[in-house]
Amino acid sequence: GDTKPSDQKKPTPTEVRTSTWDRYTNARIQKLHPKIRQMVINFINDAQDRGYKLRVTSGLRTFEEQQALYSKGRTTGGRKVTNARPGTSFHNYGLAIDVVEIGPQKGMDGFKKGYDKSRWDDIGKLGKEHGFFWGGDFRSLSDKPHFEFNDEKKLKIRGPNGLLEKYR
């Protein structure tokens, strides 16, 4: 017989999506620690559903890349962008991401003139809902694009040298 449109199967709201809208983000997610890959996918997709088109700009980072960032504003020019030395950043273990909102100007990062700062608060709140610790809550150097795996804050897994021993 005849099937009415209401009889057709509708996708369930609990359907798990395995990728995001953005191929650059998807490639970076694959390099993250397996423990947070789906969390990041869910966060990015939920943000998009709420009108925030986010791209992961940084995920897993080598100690050398971390040293280059740590040097900014210290031994090289520019402003300080991190307080994390190599080995002490959650990025070094694939447990953190930095995001940018892709807007009409292709890459407004919340630091540019004219950006609605309240959007970062909304994005930060959303990240926390997905189980991340938000860099916007850092006490010393606010890092609104930064999100890291929250459970590690509770587990106190840093060794005496500050490294995240569990993920070395």
Pin down the residues of each PLM region.
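Catalytic cores and adjacent binding grooves of peptidoglycan-active enzymes
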Residues: 84-168
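Active-site acidic/histidine clusters and adjacent loop/turn architecture
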Residues: 16-58
